[in-house]
From Swiss-Prot:
EC number(s) on file: 2.4.2.59
Cross-referenced Pfam families: Thi4 (PF01946)
GO biological process, one term: thiamine diphosphate biosynthetic process
UniProtKB keywords: Iron, Metal-binding, NAD, Thiamine biosynthesis, Transferase
This protein's name: Thiamine thiazole synthase
Residues that coordinate or bind glycine: R237
Length: 267
């Protein structure tokens, strides 16, 4: 096959990448919402927040998105979704196979690819390879006002490097089972009054509903979504059924949108 390929020299490759990357960072250094974790709840939240017109930035420590979706069920490449979460997946064009009334099997690769694409197409910015290791806080009133970030590779190398800061009107902990952002805030800002009882063992039937019900604000400016909710609220885990994860993301997006609208009205 003969093909005429545009020739691009190395310096131009570097300049264009550096310029466009820095423009993104410069634009999003002041965001409406920062979501930590590009798993199912984080991506769902990003999709609905961006659709609502909020400047939404997602940090993911890995070089891929999807969180626990990719691992499927013990590396089996299928997952379970139940009603009414199927409505969210249909909205982003994920194909579902109904195996009993209200219960669906989905392909893990398709699920995470289409959910991420939907969030990006809605306007969310996802940046990989970045770890959030602290938060910004303010007093009078006491609130979380952003995050401190570092390259994941820098942390893995145990290099002593200061972070940079990203401001946000709302920070969402979608880091999963360890609720990493909320755990840091609880430890370093005790006046927030956050107590973390820890996640309980599996009880899928109850866990799904309880996770969605308990999704939301943990402290002013700080919210929990997905498995971070089970850690912070002492709820049971549910395993490879992902309805609550995407519903939790949608729920936290709706709460943040309302909270920020109220804040704008007050100011």
């Amino acid at each position: 096959m003969e093909v005429k390929i545009k020739q691009v020299e190395e310096v131009k490759i570097s300049r264009y990448i550096i310029k466009e990357t820095m423009e993104d960072w410069y634009q999003f250094v002041e965001s409406d919402v920062v979501i930590v974790g590009a798993g199912p709840s984080g991506l769902s939240a990003a999709y609905y927040l961006a659709k609502a017109g909020l400047k939404t930035l997602v940090f993911e420590r890995r070089l891929s998105f999807g969180g626990g979706i990719g691992g499927g069920a013990m590396l089996f490449h299928k997952l379970i979704i139940e009603k009414p979460a199927d409505e969210i997946l249909r909205e982003v064009n994920v194909r579902l196979k109904e195996v009993e009334e209200g219960v669906y099997v989905v392909d893990s690769a398709e699920f995470m690819a289409k959910l991420a694409t939907a969030a990006i197409d809605a306007g969310a910015k996802i940046i990989h390879g970045v770890t959030v290791d602290d938060v910004i806080f303010r007093e009078n009133p006491l609130r979380v006002a952003g995050v401190a970030v570092e390259w994941t590779a820098t942390q893995m190398a145990s290099l002593h490097v200061d972070p940079i800061f990203i401001s946000a009107k709302a920070v969402v902990d979608a880091t999963g089972h360890d609720a990493e952002v909320i755990s840091v805030a609880a430890r370093k800002i005790p006046e927030l009054g956050i107590v973390i009882p820890g996640e309980k063992s599996a009880y899928s039937e109850r866990a799904e509903e309880l996770t969605v019900i308990n999704t939301g604000k943990v402290a002013e400016g700080l919210y929990a979504a997905g498995m971070a909710v089970t850690e912070v609220k002492g709820l049971p885990r549910m395993g490879p059924i992902f309805g609550a994860m995407v519903l939790s993301g949608k729920a936290v997006a709706e709460e943040i949108t309302k909270d920020l609208l109220k804040s704008e009205i007050r100011t």
